[in-house]
């Protein structure tokens, strides 16, 4: 079934957006309160710009930019393949945004998924003798729930806060990410919260009934491009899950 955008889709997608962005901090971080800013690599360079603004405001002395290439930046679905890792593209954007010196950045260029963003960055900071007890993670706004669920599973000793660039569901789309693609991403991230928790790749997240119903309706409407294999037979379902 071909996915088409209409008022029903907008309403359902808005519910997913509100859920996924709910963890985002709305007030500026206190200067000097965090050890690092971890920017999760992706195709959206606005994340790197926001990380640079956080650093410029004194949120943390160091930015860790993490990412090799994901499906999209590797050239999937007809998109251009980035010539270098996401972390390097993010670093260039951060420098251009706030003049961040190389001494204030660590580049982690091997992670190909969100779990690796955290595990590889954790190893990198440890190798540099950097103790991380309080940290900011920034990513695309709709990754709020998944970023924190992954952080608590793979870097649990740090206290994490999620920050993202401003704007809502109607503000996020641009020429690079049209509304239809955003809806596919929202649906995919909702599924990942369930599937990845059952695989123990991330911590369980309570998904309200109306959010799960919105997800199911959007899947039925054809928004399935960002879904993953749902086979978790070899990964026991964790306790404490409340997905209906």
Named regions from a protein language model:
Residues 175-232:
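A conserved mid-domain beta-alpha-beta active-site/ligand-binding segment of alpha/beta enzyme cores
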Residues 1-186, 241-244:
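A structural signal for short, hydrophobic/glycine-enriched beta-strand patches
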